Amino acid sequence: MFPNGAPIGVPDPEETKALTQSRYDRRMDEDLYWEVGLLLEKLRQGLELGQAIISNETVGSMRSKEFEFSDDGEWPWFYNIHGAGLRRDTEIPTKVWFSLETIFNHRYYEHITHLYNIQRIKLAQGLNTTVEVPIEGYMALPGWDLSTP
């Protein structure tokens, strides 16, 4: 991924291994990452890593770079959103390949989904929201819960 070396500030190999072997698949390990300051630092670090990657890529290069992932059939709706950027291995049914473009689309869809849910919590608490979150990606799928208080 980084032929000239990793960008400054990325997790070191030990932390990367801990992140990939965490018992949680959808959140950071609360035994390692509990303090708000540390969580904000890791968020900043992740965003900066994404910016470093995108700044060195073109749309074409992002579409041509693929990464292996395991799929046990938990997310069938994923294929309805990502199209050509996600393909199942022809020989091993549980192996899928994501393009780098798809990974960044996924990040965007996840971020706006979480922002939408934060806004729902604010509305339930009687607080105002000031930004309209676009309903696209996963939230645009039929049956996605977009209810508000």
Write out the residue ranges for each language-model feature.
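Generic structural signal for short, flexible, solvent-exposed coil/loop and linker residues
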Residues: M28, I92-P93, E110
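Acidic interhelical loop/turn segments
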Residues: E48-N105, L127-M139
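Short amphipathic alpha-helical segments with heptad-repeat character
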Residues: L40, R44, E101, N105-Y108
